[in-house]
Amino acid sequence: MSITAQSVYRDTGNFFRNQFMTILLVSLLCAFITVVLGHVFSPSDAQLAQLNDGVPVSGSSGLFDLVQNMSPEQQQILLQASAASTFSGLIGNAILAGGVILIIQLVSAGQRVSALRAIGASAPILPKLFILIFLTTLLVQIGIMLVVVPGIIMAILLALAPVMLVQDKMGIFASMRSSMRLTWANMRLVAPAVLSWLLAKTLLLLFASSFAALTPEIGAVLANTLSNLISAVLLIYLFRLYMLIRQ
């Protein structure tokens, strides 16, 4: 059977509209978890204020020089802040991926579904999803740091891995290998969706500061919720595409 991107886009749009409230609640809950965890594990405001003390920002030619000019205590605070942001983001993304994929599975099986039920049903696979998303993010970030393009290619090639891990109960590395092979064979169907997702995320990041006009916490939750909705659309598309490819 010939698969067209247009038909998959149409199926994705229909599913997203029909399950919008459930997906919105999952996205909002994941955003709230991300913000709360980030706040809990981040340095205090007083510690963050120390990052500006005695650091010659104008004379630094890059991030590496800026970090080198920091005191050991400031470097530790920066490391803690970065780790808190990364960890909370990975947790939120893992719960989002598990919840959205379980919504699709439960709805496809004709069962009633709620946001809490979907997240609860995804609990057994969350540790594996967390590790998978961590490894994927690491590879993509390394690729982007090198020449940008390798990172984008890795993001495309590994896009189907979460779906395979949950749907086919594959191992972490098996799902990554299978995703690379299957995506490479169907690049014309996967690449445009992933590139659109990356573009939407980038645009959201550019306008993220405007959300802080409310309060930093509410702005962070709103920005993360929108980001999660964008990711949810991509997950629905990839799940539908994967099921069609397997037929």
Swiss-Prot record:
It holds the Pfam family UPF0259. It is found in: Cell inner membrane. The chain crosses the membrane at residues 20-40, 87-107, 118-140, 152-172, 187-209, 225-245. InterPro entries: UPF0259. It is a multi-pass membrane protein. The keyword Cell inner membrane applies. One of its GO terms (cellular component) is plasma membrane. Keywords: Cell inner membrane, Cell membrane, Membrane, Transmembrane, Transmembrane helix. HAMAP family: UPF0259 (MF_01067). Belongs to the UPF0259 family. This is UPF0259 membrane protein YciC.
